[in-house]
Curated annotation (Swiss-Prot):
UniProt catalytic activity: heme b + (2E,6E)-farnesyl diphosphate + H2O = Fe(II)-heme o + diphosphate
Organism the protein comes from: Shewanella baltica (strain OS185)
Membrane-topology annotation of the record: Multi-pass membrane protein
Subcellular location: Cell inner membrane
Gene assigned in the entry: cyoE1
Top enzyme category: transferase
Gene3D superfamilies: UbiA prenyltransferase
Family: Belongs to the UbiA prenyltransferase family. Protoheme IX farnesyltransferase subfamily.
GO CC list: plasma membrane
Other known facts: Carbon 2 of the heme B porphyrin ring is defined according to the Fischer nomenclature.
UniProt pathway: Porphyrin-containing compound metabolism; heme O biosynthesis; heme O from protoheme: step 1/1
Name of the protein: Protoheme IX farnesyltransferase 1
GO MF annotation terms: protoheme IX farnesyltransferase activity
PANTHER family in alphabetical order: 4-HYDROXYBENZOATE SOLANESYLTRANSFERASE (PTHR43448:SF7), PROTOHEME IX FARNESYLTRANSFERASE, MITOCHONDRIAL (PTHR43448)
GO BP: heme O biosynthetic process
Length: 301
């Protein structure tokens, strides 16, 4: 006689499945994005952020960002299976079907939109929806495969989070929030191009026209260096308009100098692993830069 299926025997499968769904939301990327959302919220008000827009805003934006990431997994499942960096993702490995991934992404995005629309404000809900469409459809489904400037153009969607945080609290646009968008928009190309140099052969294999594939590695190194200089200028804009004080100025200057130096090393002192060093440094650069914005806001202002 067959033994009845116990509840405990189904738990491992349940755990593995939900880990796969969680992986599809790109939690590390979303965590860094939420830091920029939080900074946008905090800089929008002189004192403490109201509890409801803080909690509901972070939750709704996180859910819609996770939805966009899941759609990215779904759309890229074929090329992900051919690349060493991504072949072990849930969809290429068959841990989740394409249909279930679509249902998950649609459900998560819809719930996030409802949270933002009903508990925060319609402006933030629609802006977050526009960012989702920009990343998941405009960038992933079209630009990524259409042009070597995919990261430059598509980077606008990924630069929106500080603005989303700002509007979640104030329900309006502000020039200061747009300065934060400009910083992330300028940061995005050197960040991704460094990774693209390291993974150039893989992108070429799947016909993704990343800049190192279409224009060569040396040209891309030059672009990275030039963009880090442009980023350093963009990072000074909050100081020039009186948005930030000396705490941010010092931190920003040090971080920008470090990023430019790493890019210079990549261009003129390249060695195995240099591109990934630039890539990793760029992550710390953005994280520490926005923490400096937060620190300056409460210590100086």
């Amino acid at each position: 006689m067959a033994k009845p299926l116990s509840i405990t025997s189904s738990l491992p499968t349940f755990s593995v499945t939900w880990r796969a769904y969680f992986e599809m939301t790109k939690p590390k990327v979303v965590a860094l994005m939420l830091l920029t959302v939080l900074v946008g919220m905090c800089l929008a008000v002189p004192h403490a952020v109201p509890v409801q827009p803080l909690l509901a805003g972070m939750l709704g934006i996180a859910m819609m960002a996770g939805s966009a990431a899941a759609l990215n997994h779904l759309i890229d499942r074929r090329i992900d299976g051919l690349m060493a960096r991504t072949y072990n993702r849930p969809l290429p490995k068959g841990r989740i079907s394409a249909t279930r991934a679509l249902i998950f992404a649609a459900s998560l995005g819809s719930l996030g939109f409802i949270v933002l629309y009903s508990l925060v404000n319609p402006l933030t809900a629609w802006l977050t929806f526009a960012s989702l469409i920009g990343y998941a459809l405009v960038y992933t489904a079209y630009l990524k495969r259409a042009t070597s400037q995919n990261i430059v153009i598509g980077g606008l969607a990924g630069a929106m989070p500080p603005l989303l945080g700002w509007t979640a609290v104030t329900n309006e646009f502000h020039g200061h929030a747009l300065l934060l968008v400009i910083i992330i928009f300028t940061w995005t190309p050197p960040h991704f191009w460094a990774l693209a140099i390291h993974r150039r052969a893989e992108y070429a294999k799947v016909d993704i026209p990343m800049l190192p594939v279409t224009h060569g590695v040396e040209f891309t190194k030059t672009c990275i260096l030039l963009y880090t200089v442009l980023l350093a200028i963009a990072c000074l804009l909050p100081v020039l308009v009186g948005m930030c004080g000396p705490v941010y100025f010092v931190c920003s200057s040090l971080l920008s100098t470090g990023f430019i130096y790493k890019a210079w090393q990549l261009k003129y002192r390249d060695h195995d692993g240099s591109a990934m060093q630039v890539f990793r440094f760029s992550i710390y650069h953005l994280m520490l830069l926005f923490m400096a914005l937060l620190l300056d806001h409460y210590l100086w202002n």
